[in-house]
């Protein structure tokens, strides 16, 4: 977390001359500023939003579903920034059998004036990078038959830049490995709703209101169990596991294109050591909690050797830029601080 703190400070310096707000979007299993008391996703023991604000920046932190799909997360981010009732879209909600406009997801807006004349910089970590690109995709397109503020019309120019840190632009082999060896994990998420109204949600909220997983007051546990057991979330592609997989990321990359009017910055990271056989093992700077997944990625035979270098969760090669299924990559170049045009 310390290294990310300094990365954020260096990124912020790029925006020092322009008074454009900065939006922070967390990654997979992330949390908001009012959760995990005393420990911030952005900054650890230091509240990065508060610190950057004290330095003269206008900064806002969104809190989106920690295990939700990028479509759902992007919609949540939009309404948290702009303000209004979250609306996942009629056709998307019908396709995946979710609540289109969940109660409790209506916001005053962190930056209500957001539009093409008042764009934002978006800084992200991990899955947050995919979420930002999905938000950009939704803003740039008009979806026929939709009436929501986000989906009904094109909104070009609303984003000035997108910065990604350790983002699985092309997915992570870890998602594939977990789905293969631990398929029950996604099935278990159906029962996370039982925590929604408990003290646990005050510390960490899975934010799955759209899936209607909450136990009703007059509902017996057996009825609740039967209802939730049949929830489509267990096998749905409207979920982080699909978006973070190599196949899911590739599917999104095929419909996504970068915008020549938007600046993109990607910060690939790693914390492994290469061995003679081209496999990778964790270095001493990596958290012990990430050693097991890091070794799974670093020794996987399901990918080329270049995918073995990783940060414990994502292969470094996947963090650079999006690549489509035909092998075509989005325009990219090595960062030059003297020339960012």
Segments from the language model and where they lie:
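Sec-dependent N-terminal signal peptides
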Residues: 4-13
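Generic alpha-helical secondary structure signal
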Residues: 8, 55, 228-229
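N-terminal hydrophobic or amphipathic segments with adjacent small-residue motifs
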Residues: 10, 21, 122, 292, ...
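N-terminal non-catalytic accessory region
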Residues: 16-123, 127-186
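Helical cap/lid subdomain of alpha/beta-hydrolase-fold lipid enzymes
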Residues: 137, 141-341
